Design a protein with these regions (language model features):
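Glycine-rich phosphate-binding loops of nucleotide-dependent enzymes
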Residues: 1-129
Length: 129
């Protein structure tokens, strides 16, 4: 493939084909975040770190970002730092939960949901002891 074909393929993968001729600074915030992911993909990285990839997005933009992240995670390893637990549970195969900089749990989403320390710290659930 030539560079134009590869670029067009990536823009299609990112759902950004419609704004190929728009300067990056004029794109919506969500499209700018998608473009940032695309630049990382174009670099050939097999492992990608995403810091708060849905922060500041509307519900519809978050849903679109989650769909994109799921798609790119099929071929790459992703490390995601995210405070939106709904997004975390939707995306992750394994989760490490930190409280004040210390890991309190690392497990599957199902096990993390059931973990008492996580429930108390993030979900506001306290059990009788």
């Amino acid at each position: 493939k030539n560079l134009n074909d590869s670029t067009n393929d990536l823009l299609n993968q990112l759902s950004l084909r419609h704004c190929a001729h728009i300067p990056a600074g004029l794109l919506s915030y969500a499209d700018q975040r998608s473009l940032e992911i695309g630049i990382t993909i174009a670099s050939g990285a097999n492992t990608i770190m995403l810091d708060e990839p849905t922060s500041g997005m509307s519900n519809s933009e978050t849903a679109r970002a989650v769909t994109l992240i799921k798609k790119i995670s099929e071929k790459r390893t992703l490390v995601i730092v995210e405070h939106d637990m709904g997004v975390v549970f939707d995306l992750a195969d394994r989760i490490s939960v930190l409280v004040y900089g210390e890991i309190i749990c690392t497990d599957t989403p199902e096990k993390v949901r059931e973990n008492q320390a996580v429930q108390e710290a993030y979900l506001g659930i306290e059990r009788n002891r």
